[in-house]
Regions:
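Juxtamembrane luminal stem/stalk of type II transmembrane Golgi/ER carbohydrate-processing enzymes
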Residues: 1-55
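Extracellular/periplasmic catalytic domains that process cell-envelope and extracellular macromolecules
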Residues: 45-49, 104-105, 170-171, 182-185
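Short, charged/polar "capping" segments at the starts of alpha-helices
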Residues: 63, 91-98
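Histidine-anchored nucleotide/phosphate-binding helix
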Residues: 63-81
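Short internal beta-strands
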Residues: 83-90
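Active-site-proximal specificity loops/subdomain of glycosyltransferases
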Residues: 95-96, 100-147
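GT-A fold catalytic core of metal-dependent nucleotide-sugar glycosyltransferases
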Residues: 138-186, 190-198
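Catalytic core and acceptor-binding pocket of nucleotide-sugar-dependent glycosyltransferases
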Residues: 199-215
Length: 215
């Protein structure tokens, strides 16, 4: 069965010269012809001493649905001193939809669009993003979401929550935790790490080194 290929933003990055001193691209292929372009951060980088939490919308949707908006709103309401950040991968975000307009009313909710190619540059997952086959097959969005949640906390520290988790109490007294799926497995739907915590670097590197494409 043929599956659609998820577009890799900034795909030219995978073919540019990794160094001015040789003609290999970042994927190790020869005969590259141009230097890798520079890039600029796409949104204000959160202060590293700021309490923050991240949600990710990686399907390319223009907005979040009502259930997802409730999850974001509940976290902001229960934790007024927490900066709640929604990162979206879509290219045409509808900030005038009912859900997005509601979220934008909160001072502690920030909504940013990320350009995926730039987000992975100069990180341990750069080659994974540009050189592996993660974007083929039926699980591309899921694989991208897994990579982004680990990479985001690797870059900034803080909390990560899936968009189907509703908060009924404050969370900021929980630190450096991850939920359990069962007695043998951990779940990556809710976790926290302090900035530069060694565990998150280990998680990112293990994801990179053990990733296997699943048809």
């Amino acid at each position: 069965m043929n599956h659609p290929v998820m577009n890799v933003s900034g795909a030219e990055r995978g073919r540019c010269c990794a160094s001015i001193h040789h003609s290999l691209d970042i994927c190790g292929r020869s005969d590259c012809f141009w230097n890798c372009p520079s890039f600029e951060p796409q949104f204000p980088i959160p202060q590293r001493d700021l309490e923050k939490a991240f949600f990710l919308e990686t399907s390319g949707a223009r907005n979040v649905n009502f259930r997802q908006a409730c999850a974001i709103e509940s976290l902001a309401l229960m934790n007024p001193h927490l900066t709640v950040i929604l990162l979206m991968s879509g290219k045409d975000i509808d900030l005038e939809s009912t859900t997005m307009k509601t979220l934008r009313k909160y001072d502690n909710i920030k909504i940013y669009v990320i350009k995926l190619g730039d987000y992975f540059i100069h990180t341990p997952l750069e080659q994974w993003y540009f050189c592996s086959t993660w974007n083929y097959g039926p699980y591309a969005v899921s694989h991208l979401s897994d990579a982004l949640r680990f990479l985001t906390l690797y870059k900034y520290g803080g909390y990560y929550f899936d968009l189907d988790i509703i908060m009924i109490q404050p969370v900021t007294h929980y630190r450096n935790f991850i939920g359990a799926e069962n007695e043998n497995n951990l779940a990556a739907g809710a976790f926290h790490v302090d900035y530069l915590h060694p565990v998150i670097r280990m998680a990112v590197e293990e994801f990179r080194d053990t990733y296997r494409y699943v048809r």
